[in-house]
C-alpha cells in the first residue's frame, strides 16, 4: 500500500483500532494496547493459527546507539530463556526504522490490577469443579466464577502462596543464569489463565499463572527510577538503592518481600511521595514490620476488619524486609523456606473455603524447623524493637543506617529444595498458545540481533543444586517449548572483565551474548512458530539435563555475564547534597538568636546573582510550569522535556499501569536557549522564567510539595526550594548578622557557585547545538512516510520510500551527514565535560558547607543556620540535580574521548566581553555589566587548577588568561561607576 495512505490513515485513526490490517512477517497487527517513550505495543495474532500475540514496535529514531545496543543484547537474552513463569519472546524483526518484538500475550493484566480488582478480571474467571465448595458460589451466565478473595485487605492465602512460589521459580531460574531482575513490582508480574494442559499437570485450578516481565531492562533502571519517583517504582526498591549505594542480587529479595506484603495486606509496606521520604520511613521503622491485624490487637479494637496474616508469611516478610543486605534473608534460605509448599500443585482433598477470612495453612507447616525458628525469632525481636525518630538523611552519617533488630536465625543445613516440582507429577510442558500482555516499559539491555557477537567461556564456581529434578511429561505435544521449572542454584559468575578482578572493583554488568550458531543436527529446535529466517531460529533454548542440571546449548557456550557478581553504582553525591540541604533548612527554623561577631553586611558585589524574575509568590503562575522529567537512563529524550498524556488502551478494561512515563514532546527543551546578542533584553541572555528551569527528579518532587506551602513561612523548606529552583544564580542578600567564619564561607562558596554556573550555561549551549544537529541529521536522513510514532508495518511502503531515498542521495549529501554526526558527537562531548566540571565546583562548594556545618554543630548544640546559608544550600541542591541529570543524558549521546574544551571556554569569554562592550556602547549598561562578569568568571574557572586533569595549569596559559582579564576588569569598574552615578548611589 502507498506509504502516504498508510501514514494518513494512522493520523486519522485514534490509535485504538485500524481500518485495515497490517502485517509483520506472518503476524497480523491489531489494535494499539500501550505506548511508551520509544515503543508502541499492539495486539496481534499469527495469520495462520490466529494465536494472539503482542507486538512491541521500538522506534530506532528514538534510540541512541548505546540504547540500541542494549536492546539488541536484551533480545539475545530473551531468545534463549524458556520458563513457564517468564514471558517469552516469540519472534523479532527489524528494518531501517523500527525493531519489532513479537512476545507472549497475557490476557489477565498484572498483579497490581488483580489486587485492586480483587481478582475480578474478565479473562480470569473459571468453572468451579463439581462437588467442590466453590461450586456453591454464585456464577455468571456462563457458569463461571472468580476466585473468592476477602472483600478487604490482601488476597486469599492460597493465591498468595501460589503466586509467591511461581515468582520464586522465576527468580531462581534467572539467578542460575546470573541474571538479576532489579525491578520486581506488581506491575511487572503479569497474569494469564492456566491452560487445560497446565491444570492437568497439576497447576492449582482457578489460580492464574504468574509471569515475570521486563526482567532484562533493569541494569540501567536504578538511576532511572530515581527520576520515576512519582510513578511508584521506588515503593518496591531496596533501601540500599534509595541510599545510592552499590547493591547486589539481594536487592531483588527486598522487592519480593514488598510484593508479598502487598499481596498479604493489600498495600505496600512503605508509602511516600518521593524516595527521600520513603527512605526515612524505612529507616524509622527500624526493621519493625507491623501488620494491620497486629495494630488492631494492640489497640484492643473491636473492629475486626483486617484479615489475619499467617505467622509463617509474616516471618518471611520480616526476614526479607531487612534494611541492611547482610541481615536480609539469603537466596538459599528463601528458596527453602517452604511457605509455598503444598500450594504449587492441585490438592486432591476437598477444599475448605471461607469467604470472610483466608484459611491459615501455616499450621500444616509445623514440621518445618525453619519456619518455627523464623516465627519464634521474629516474635522475640518484635518485643525488643522500639521505634526511633528518623535521623536526618545524611548518607555519610552512621545514624542513617541504625542497627536492625536481632536477625532471624536460619538453618542452612537443610539441602532439600522446596521449590522443585513434587515428584508425583510431571513437569508441565509449554503450551502451544502463548498469551502475553506487554506493558510500555522499554527495553534497555543488549547486542546485535543478527548475528550476536561471540564472547569468552564461562567459568563455573560451584556445582548446581542436586535437589532439582525434572521429567518430561508423557503428554507433551509435538515439539513443545521446553519448560525449566526451577533453575539450579549454580553460582556461575561470569565477568566480561575477567575473573581475576578485585572484589572491590565495580564493573558494568555484561549481558549474555550468545554467538551465532546454526541449528544443531543432534538437537532439533522446539517449534515456537518461528520463521526460519528469524534471528530467533539461531538460538537454541536452555534445557534441563537428565541429571537435573541445566544444559546450555551452543547458543550459550562461551557466553559471559557479570550480572551475578557485579554491583551497580548510583551517584551517591546526589543524596548527600540533598540531605545536607534539608538539614540546613531544618536548622534555619529553630527559634534561637544567633551569635554575631560583627554587625556589618558583606560588601561583595552580588549583582551577578540577582535573578531577573521576582521572588516566587504563592500566586506565581509560573510555578505550574515546573514539570516532571522522564528517566534519563531509559529514554532518548533529554531529561528536561515535557510529559504528554498517555493514550488509553483500547479493548482492555484493565490496562497495565505504566512503568515508565508516556511519550514525550520534541526538542528544543525550554531550559536550553540560544544565546542572543547583548543588545537584546538582559532577561533573554541572563535570565529565564522560573517555570522553564528544570531541576533533578528529587528537587522537582520536593518543589511540587513546596508549592502548596509557599507563603506559610519565610524560612520553610518549600519557600527555599521553590526559590532556589527559580534562580539561575544564588541570590545572597545579607539580612542578618553573621560571624566572620560564616561570612568567609559564603564568600568562598559564592565564588565556586559563579564558576559552576558559567560552565553550566556554556554546557547548555553545546547541548542545544547537539540537539539541533541531531534534528538536522534526522530530517535529512529520514524518508517521507517513515517519521512519526506509529511504525510503518507495510513492507511495500517502506521499500518504496527507501528506493526514493536512494535515488535522491549523493556522495555530497553523505559527506554532509558524516560531518553532521561528527559535529553532533563533538558537541555532546563538550557538554558532558562542562557539566562534569560544573558539578565538581558544586560538590566542592557543598563540601565546604558540610565541613563548616559539622564543625559548628559539634561546638554549639542546636546551632541555627542563617537564612543566607540556607538559601545557598538550596541553590546548590537545585543546580546539582539539574546539572547531574543533564550530564547523564548528554553522556548517552557522547563518544568515548572526553577532553576539557578549555579553548571553547576561552573563546566564549572573549566573545562575551566583546558583546558586553557593544551593549555598553548602545547604552544597555545592565546587560554590559552582566556580560563582563560572565566573561571574568569564565576566565576565573580556567585559572582554577582543579579543572585540569593533572591538577595544574600551563604557565603560558595562565599568563594569557590573566592578561586578558585586566582590560575586562577595567571596563567593569568603569561601568559600575557609571551605574552608581546614574542611580545616585556611591560607587560600590
From Swiss-Prot:
The main location class comes to cytoplasm
The ranges of region (Disordered) come to 1-21, 394-561
Q: What GO CC annotations are associated with the protein?
A: autophagosome; cytosol; phagophore assembly site membrane
Renumbered to this chain, the Pro residues biased-composition regions fall at 449-463
Look up the EC number in the record and give it.
Answer: 2.7.11.1
Q: Which UniProt keywords apply?
A: ATP-binding, Autophagy, Cytoplasm, Kinase, Membrane, Nucleotide-binding, Protein transport, Serine/threonine-protein kinase, Transferase, Transport
Q: Which residues lie in Polar residues bias regions?
A: 468-478
Specify whether Ribonucleoprotein is a keyword of the entry. Answer: no
Is the Isomerase keyword given for this protein? no
> How does the protein associate with the membrane?
Peripheral membrane protein
Show the active-site residues.
183
Similarity-based family: Belongs to the protein kinase superfamily. Ser/Thr protein kinase family. APG1/unc-51/ULK1 subfamily.
- Name this polypeptide is given: Serine/threonine-protein kinase ATG1
Amino acid at each position: 500500500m502507498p506509504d502516504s495512505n498508510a501514514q494518513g490513515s494512522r493520523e486519522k485513526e485514534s490509535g485504538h483500532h485500524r481500518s485495515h490490517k497490517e502485517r509483520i512477517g506472518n503476524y497480523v497487527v491489531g489494535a494499539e494496547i500501550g505506548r511508551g517513550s520509544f515503543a508502541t505495543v499492539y495486539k496481534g495474532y499469527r495469520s495462520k493459527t490466529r494465536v494472539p500475540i503482542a507486538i512491541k514496535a521500538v522506534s530506532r529514531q528514538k534510540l541512541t546507539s548505546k540504547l540500541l545496543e542494549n536492546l539488541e543484547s536484551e533480545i539475545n537474552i530473551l531468545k534463549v530463556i524458556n520458563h513457564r513463569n517468564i514471558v517469552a519472546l516469540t519472534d523479532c524483526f527489524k528494518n531501517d526504522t523500527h525493531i519489532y518484538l513479537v512476545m507472549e500475550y497475557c490476557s489477565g493484566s498484572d498483579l497490581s490490577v488483580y489486587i485492586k480488582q480483587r481478582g475480578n478480571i474478565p479473562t480470569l474467571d473459571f468453572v468451579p469443579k463439581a462437588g467442590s465448595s466453590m461450586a456453591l458460589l454464585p456464577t455468571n451466565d456462563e457458569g463461571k466464577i472468580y476466585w473468592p478473595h476477602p472483600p478487604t485487605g490482601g488476597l486469599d492465602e492460597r493465591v498468595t502462596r501460589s503466586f509467591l512460589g511461581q515468582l520464586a521459580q522465576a527468580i531462581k531460574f534467572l539467578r542460575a543464569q546470573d541474571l538479576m531482575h532489579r525491578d520486581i513490582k506488581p506491575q511487572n508480574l503479569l497474569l494469564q489463565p492456566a491452560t487445560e494442559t497446565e491444570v492437568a499437570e497439576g497447576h492449582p485450578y482457578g489460580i492464574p499463572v504468574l509471569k515475570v516481565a521486563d526482567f532484562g531492562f533493569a541494569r540501567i533502571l536504578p538511576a532511572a527510577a530515581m527520576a520515576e519517583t512519582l510513578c511508584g517504582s521506588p515503593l518496591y526498591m531496596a533501601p540500599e538503592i534509595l541510599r545510592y549505594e552499590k547493591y547486589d542480587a539481594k536487592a531483588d529479595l527486598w522487592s519480593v518481600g514488598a510484593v508479598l506484603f502487598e499481596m498479604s495486606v493489600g498495600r505496600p509496606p512503605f508509602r511516600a511521595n518521593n524516595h527521600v521520604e520513603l527512605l526515612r520511613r524505612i529507616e524509622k521503622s527500624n526493621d519493625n514490620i507491623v501488620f494491620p491485624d497486629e495494630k488492631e490487637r494492640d489497640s484492643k479494637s473491636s473492629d475486626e476488619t483486617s484479615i489475619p496474616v499467617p505467622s509463617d508469611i509474616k516471618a518471611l516478610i520480616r526476614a526479607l524486609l531487612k534494611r541492611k543486605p547482610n541481615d536480609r534473608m539469603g537466596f538459599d534460605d528463601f528458596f527453602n523456606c517452604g511457605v509455598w509448599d503444598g500450594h504449587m500443585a492441585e490438592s486432591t482433598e476437598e477444599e475448605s473455603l471461607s469467604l470472610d477470612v483466608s484459611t491459615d495453612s501455616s499450621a500444616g507447616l509445623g514440621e518445618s524447623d525453619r519456619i518455627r525458628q523464623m516465627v519464634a525469632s521474629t516474635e522475640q525481636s518484635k518485643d525488643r524493637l522500639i521505634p526511633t525518630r528518623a535521623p536526618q538523611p545524611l548518607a555519610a552519617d552512621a545514624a542513617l543506617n541504625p542497627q536492625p533488630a536481632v536477625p532471624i536465625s536460619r538453618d542452612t543445613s537443610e539441602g532439600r529444595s522446596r521449590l522443585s516440582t513434587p515428584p508425583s507429577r510431571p513437569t508441565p510442558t509449554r503450551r502451544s498458545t502463548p498469551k502475553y500482555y506487554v506493558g510500555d516499559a522499554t527495553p534497555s539491555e543488549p547486542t546485535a540481533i543478527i548475528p550476536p557477537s561471540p564472547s569468552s567461556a564461562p567459568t563455573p564456581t560451584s556445582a548446581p543444586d542436586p535437589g532439582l529434578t525434572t521429567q518430561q511429561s508423557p503428554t507433551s505435544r509435538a515439539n513443545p517449548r521446553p519448560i525449566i521449572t526451577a533453575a539450579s542454584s549454580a553460582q556461575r559468575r561470569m565477568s566480561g572483565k575477567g575473573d581475576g578482578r578485585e572484589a572491590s572493583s565495580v564493573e558494568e554488568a555484561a549481558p549474555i551474548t550468545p554467538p551465532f550458531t546454526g541449528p544443531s543436527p543432534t538437537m532439533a529446535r522446539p517449534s515456537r512458530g518461528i520463521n526460519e529466517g528469524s534471528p530467533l531460529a539461531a538460538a537454541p533454548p536452555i534445557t534441563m539435563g537428565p541429571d537435573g542440571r541445566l544444559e546450555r546449548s551452543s547458543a550459550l557456550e562461551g557466553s559471559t555475564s557479570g550480572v551475578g557478581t557485579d554491583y551497580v553504582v548510583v551517584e551517591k553525591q546526589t543524596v548527600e547534597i540533598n540531605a545536607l540541604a534539608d538539614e540546613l533548612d531544618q536548622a534555619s527554623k529553630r527559634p534561637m538568636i544567633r551569635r554575631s561577631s560583627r554587625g556589618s553586611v558583606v560588601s561583595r558585589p552580588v549583582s551577578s546573582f540577582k535573578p531577573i524574575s521576582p521572588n516566587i509568590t504563592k500566586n506565581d503562575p509560573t510555578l505550574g510550569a515546573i514539570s516532571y522529567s522522564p528517566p534519563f537512563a531509559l529514554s532518548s529524550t533529554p531529561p528536561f522535556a515535557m510529559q504528554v498524556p498517555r493514550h488509553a488502551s483500547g479493548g482492555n478494561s484493565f490496562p497495565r499501569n505504566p512503568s515508565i512515563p508516556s511519550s514525550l514532546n520534541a526538542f528544543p527543551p525550554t531550559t536550553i536557549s540560544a544565546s542572543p546578542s547583548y543588545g537584546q533584553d538582559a532577561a533573554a541572555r541572563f535570565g529565564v522564567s522560573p517555570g522553564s528551569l528544570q531541576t533533578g527528579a528529587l528537587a522537582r518532587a520536593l518543589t511540587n510539595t513546596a508549592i502548596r506551602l509557599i507563603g506559610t513561612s519565610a524560612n520553610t523548606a518549600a519557600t527555599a526550594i521553590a526559590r532556589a529552583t527559580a534562580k539561575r544564580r544564588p541570590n545572597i542578600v545579607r539580612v542578618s548578622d553573621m560571624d566572620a567564619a560564616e561570612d568567609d564561607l559564603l564568600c568562598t562558596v559564592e565564588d565556586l557557585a559563579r564558576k559552576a554556573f558559567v560552565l553550566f550555561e556554556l554546557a547548555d549551549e553545546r547541548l542545544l547545538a547537539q540537539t539541533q544537529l541531531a534534528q538536522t541529521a534526522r530530517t535529512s536522513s529520514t524518508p517521507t512516510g517513515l517519521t512519526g510514532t506509529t511504525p510503518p508495518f507495510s513492507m511495500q511502503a517502506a521499500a518504496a520510500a527507501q528506493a526514493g531515498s536512494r535515488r535522491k542521495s549523493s556522495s555530497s549529501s553523505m559527506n554532509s551527514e558524516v560531518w553532521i554526526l561528527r559535529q553532533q558527537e563533538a558537541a555532546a562531548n563538550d557538554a558532558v565535560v562542562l557539566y562534569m566540571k560544573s558539578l565538581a565546583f558544586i560538590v566542592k562548594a557543598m563540601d565546604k558547607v558540610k565541613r563548616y556545618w559539622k564543625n559548628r554543630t559539634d561546638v554549639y548544640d542546636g546551632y541555627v543556620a542563617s537564612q543566607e546559608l540556607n538559601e545557598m544550600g538550596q541553590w546548590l541542591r537545585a543546580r546539582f540535580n539539574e546539572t547531574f541529570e543533564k550530564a547523564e543524558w548528554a553522556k548517552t549521546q557522547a563518544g568515548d574521548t572526553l577532553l576539557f574544551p578549555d579553548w571553547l571556554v576561552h573563546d566564549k569569554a572573549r566573545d562575551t566581553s566583546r558583546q558586553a562592550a557593544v551593549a555598553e556602547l548602545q547604552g544597555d549598561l545592565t546587560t554590559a555589566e552582566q556580560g563582563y562578569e560572565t566573561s571574568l568568571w569564565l576566565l576565573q574557572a580556567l585559572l582554577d587548577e582543579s579543572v585540569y586533569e593533572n591538577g595544574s595549569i600551563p604557565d603560558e596559559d595562565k599568563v594569557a588568561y590573566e592578561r586578558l582579564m585586566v582590560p575586562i576588569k577595567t571596563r567593569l569598574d568603569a561601568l559600575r561607576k557609571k551605574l552608581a552615578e546614574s542611580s545616585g548611589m556611591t560607587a560600590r
